[in-house]
Amino acid sequence: XTCESPSHKFKGPCATNRNCES
């Protein structure tokens, strides 16, 4: 999936998004 971090709206795979909170 995709994830959205509360700090910045990054949409992409959680595995490549270190700022994502799954």
UniProtKB/Swiss-Prot annotation:
A GO biological process held by the record: defense response to bacterium
InterPro entries documented for this protein: Scorpion_toxin-like_sf (IPR036574)
Protein keywords: Antibiotic, Antimicrobial, Fungicide, Plant defense
The protein's role, per its UniProt record: Antimicrobial peptide. Active against Gram-positive and Gram-negative bacterial pathogens.
Family per record: Belongs to the DEFL family. Group II subfamily.
Designated name of the protein: Defensin D1
Native source organism of the sequence: Spinacia oleracea (Spinach)
Biological classification of the source: Eukaryota, Viridiplantae, Streptophyta, Embryophyta, Tracheophyta
